[in-house]
Design a protein with these regions (language model features):
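Flexible, acidic/Gly-rich N-terminal and inter-domain linker regions that tether
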Residues: 1-80
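Conserved beta-strand segments that form the floor/walls of ligand-binding pockets within enzyme
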Residues: 88, 134, 163
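Conserved alpha-helical substructure of the radical SAM core
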Residues: 103-134
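C-terminal accessory regions of radical SAM enzymes
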Residues: 20, 275-311
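Surface-exposed cleft-lining segments at the edges of enzyme active sites
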Residues: 107-108, 137-138, 164
Length: 311
């Protein structure tokens, strides 16, 4: 969906300085993801549509909020843990989520690794001694099947476990084709980590995409982000967790929002997040309870946020 179509469908976008916002962070709006959303408060629109607030500096802004720059031994590679290596296959996404923690910085120049960089990152992963490689981006499913499978095959057999961190089943569910699913199944163990923030994102098309993966034996887990005005209440998070478990998707992490420049409107104070999580814990079973985590700017890696009965 282009700017003209989006502005016609969502009249409040007329007040948005589209050029300025998109020059800082791209805008991409698939019709399928937006679905029938039409009100400013719809969670899909809040997280996908550009807003002038993205241009406003905030005292809490941290350009690299999870400390990836200092933990990047090569372009397109992040190494925070001895047993894991993260490879960024691309900077492209099907939707550019306005709260994204990598919106201000990603290791690597351009939209995709060069051939030389691609070879170097796979060589690094193979020699790393890691037990898991995380394929991320951008969105790793914004690359072709051939490119994705080349990344998986390129680190095997040295690295046994592959994780594909993607929003494609949610934002572009037609990407989850029979060919892709069979390729992932044949390369097991491959875990798919999806990113659902609100029950409204679980459309019939998304359900079908998730089912294709799970039915083929590809394990699927979810990571959400606690977002102001989107899911910052326990009832919404509980509904999401229950819906995920019904779809055989494990609610793995609830991330405290990272303070990257441009996403201040989505941030939730930590004390409030703790209170919300304490309430959530009373509303769902252990199976449906994600771990509430924070990824600090020192690059040491995420940790579980301690929460007592009152928050």
């Amino acid at each position: 969906m282009g700017r003209a179509e989006a502005s016609g469908r969502f009249p409040w976008l007329a007040a948005v300085d589209w050029e300025a916002v998109s020059s800082v962070f791209p805008v991409r709006l698939p019709r399928g993801y937006l679905g029938d959303a039409h009100t400013p408060g719809d969670p899909r629109l809040l997280t996908a549509l550009p807003a002038n607030a993205e241009l406003e500096a905030d005292v809490g802004d941290i350009p690299d909020p999870v400390g990836e720059q200092a933990r990047s031994p090569l372009p397109w590679v992040v190494r925070k843990h001895e047993d894991r290596v993260l490879l960024l296959l691309t900077k492209r996404c099907h939707v550019y989520c306005r709260f994204c923690f990598r919106r201000d910085h990603q290791p690597g120049e351009g939209e995709d690794p060069s051939d030389v960089e691609w070879g170097a990152m796979l060589d690094y992963a193979r020699a790393s001694g890691a037990k898991e490689v995380i394929l991320s981006g951008g969105d790793p499913l914004a690359v072709t099947d051939a490119r994705l499978f080349a990344a998986i095959d390129g680190v095997r057999p040295e690295v046994p476990v592959i994780r594909v961190h993607t929003r494609a089943p949610i934002t572009f569910p037609s990407r989850i084709t029979a060919k892709l699913v069979e390729g992932l199944r044949a390369r097991a163990p491959v875990w798919v980590f999806v990113h659902v923030n609100h029950p409204a994102e679980l459309t019939a098309e998304v359900d079908a995409a998730l089912a294709r993966l799970v039915d083929a034996g590809v394990p699927v887990v979810n990571q959400s982000v606690l977002l102001r005005s989107v899911n910052d209440d326990a009832a919404t998070l509980a509904a999401l967790s229950h819906a995920l478990v019904e779809r055989r998707v494990f609610p793995y992490y609830l991330h405290h929002p990272d303070a990257v420049p441009g996403n201040a409107a989505f941030r939730v104070p930590l004390a409030e997040g703790r209170r919300i999580y304490a309430s959530l814990r009373r509303m769902v079973s252990g199976l449906a309870l994600p771990t509430y985590v924070m990824d600090p700017p020192d690059g040491s890696g995420k940790f579980a946020i301690p929460v007592d009965a009152s928050g």
